[in-house]
């Protein structure tokens, strides 16, 4: 929880409700009870735009208001990478729909994974990924909500190279300090290098075990230097949300 982190006056903390594994209305109450001021909703499995009626939407907004919670961001998870051509059109259409839904709900950021960035820009998979992300960036420009990618064992150089090739509209980064630690990357250095792309930050922790494997652990028990990272976010006047997410273990 955010109580395990140093206090930073200007930073905003949200909870990813899907990790509570509860019905959404209960999840919202749980998020409020742990001191979050915002929530991140999964708009593929938890709250499908196509299944939310106008009345349902009003009820959701009312409940959030009653609990003094804001919608921080949406998550759109996919099973396959955005450079895997199998059922790619459906994934892209789903993500575009999530961006439209986000804007209609006053949300400006949708996070998700695109798969590990291929190493060589000349590979067909790399070119396909750039084509897809430029298409999504154009859509973001049109609808007013931006896709922020959560890295998958990608280096700073790999991320920077990809961002440089997405020129048709905005593309952001969902900084995942635990994922970076588990991939042998430094979250602070990554933020320094790509700070202008960071739209959202995940609050989860990780470490490298004796075999060099990445392991997710409760916040404060891993190798993420939170004092330094949060101080840097505050100094840089970071305006996005820090979202508590824990994808494994009992102490979520």
Please identify what each model-predicted range represents:
Residues 23-29, 63-66, 81-173, 182:
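Active-site acidic/histidine proton-transfer and metal-coordination neighborhood
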Residues 1-107, 134, 168:
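N-terminal pre-domain/capping segments
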Residues 70, 146, 239:
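Conserved H-loop
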Residues 1-13, 21-35, 65-67, 106, ...:
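Histidine-acidic metal/acid-base catalytic patches
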Residues 16-20, 42-46, 76-79, 115-117, ...:
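Active-site beta-loop-alpha junctions enriched in small/polar residues
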Residues 40, 73-75, 111, 199-202, ...:
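Conserved beta-strand positions in the central sheet of alpha/beta enzyme cores
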């Amino acid at each position: 929880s955010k109580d395990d982190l140093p206090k930073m006056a200007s930073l905003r903390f949200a909870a990813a409700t899907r990790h509570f594994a509860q019905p959404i209305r209960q999840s919202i109450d749980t998020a409020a009870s742990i001191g979050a001021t915002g929530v991140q909703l999964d708009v593929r499995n938890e709250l499908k735009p196509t299944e939310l009626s106008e009345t349902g939407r009003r009820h959701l907004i009312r409940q959030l208001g009653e609990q003094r919670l804001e919608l921080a961001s949406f998550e759109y998870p996919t099973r396959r990478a955005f450079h895997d051509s199998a059922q790619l059109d459906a994934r892209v259409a789903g993500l575009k729909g999530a961006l439209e839904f986000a804007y209609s709900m006053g949300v400006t950021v949708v996070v998700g994974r695109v798969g590990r960035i291929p190493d060589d820009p000349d590979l067909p998979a790399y070119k396909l990924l750039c084509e897809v992300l430029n298409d999504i960036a154009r859509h973001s420009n049109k609808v007013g909500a931006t896709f922020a990618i959560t890295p998958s064992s990608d280096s700073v150089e790999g991320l920077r190279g990809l961002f440089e090739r997405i020129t048709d509209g905005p593309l952001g980064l969902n900084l995942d300090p635990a994922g970076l630690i588990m991939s042998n990357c430094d979250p602070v250095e990554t933020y320094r290098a790509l700070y202008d792309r960071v739209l959202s930050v995940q609050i989860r922790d990780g470490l490298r075990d004796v075999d060099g494997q990445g392991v997710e652990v409760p916040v404060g028990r891993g190798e993420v230097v939170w004092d330094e990272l949060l101080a840097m976010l505050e100094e840089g006047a970071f305006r996005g949300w820090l979202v508590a997410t824990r994808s494994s273990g009992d102490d979520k």
